[in-house]
Amino acid sequence: MRYAIFAAFLLLGACATAPAQAQAQCPPAGFSRAELDALRAAEWALHDDARRNALALALVRGCLDNPDPGLRDVILFEALSHWLRGQQLTNQTMLAIADNLEPRLAAPEGEGFERPFAALVLSEVARADRIAPYMTDARRRRLLDASIAYFTTVRD
């Protein structure tokens, strides 16, 4: 019986720590803050398409709700805006970003960064679709519905 209880506690402990290990980090793995600052100084020139697309998604996953405005506002938003406006992200990456951000519009308020920055970045994703359509009509409608639902809950 003691072993069963001990095993149960170990299992619960493992479950409790699993999300922390699965959480995305900011700065993303493989990039230091200094490297991201250097990338910004180089006007976001990242010539490896796969690495650029992976970084864009990693920034969204890890930095969107970061309380550091230098990471969230400057690194995340400026990089994504630059790459989206320059049509430097694949359709697959843009859809993955939208898929990551859309549920965040309905997330609990937290520190107050996640929901508004999800909306801000989604506006850039939607703009990219307006310039060069890549979403299906159904996907575009889903994004519109989620955005409207978010905006009706905003109290300032």
Predicted regions located by residue number:
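Short inter-helical turns and helix N-cap capping residues of alpha-solenoid HEAT/ARM repeat scaffolds
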Residues: 67-69, 110-111
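Eukaryote-skewed repeat-based solenoidal scaffolds used as protein-protein interaction platforms
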Residues: 102, 106-156
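Flexible loop/turn segments at the boundaries of HEAT repeats in alpha-solenoid HEAT proteins
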Residues: 44-50, 83-94, 126-140
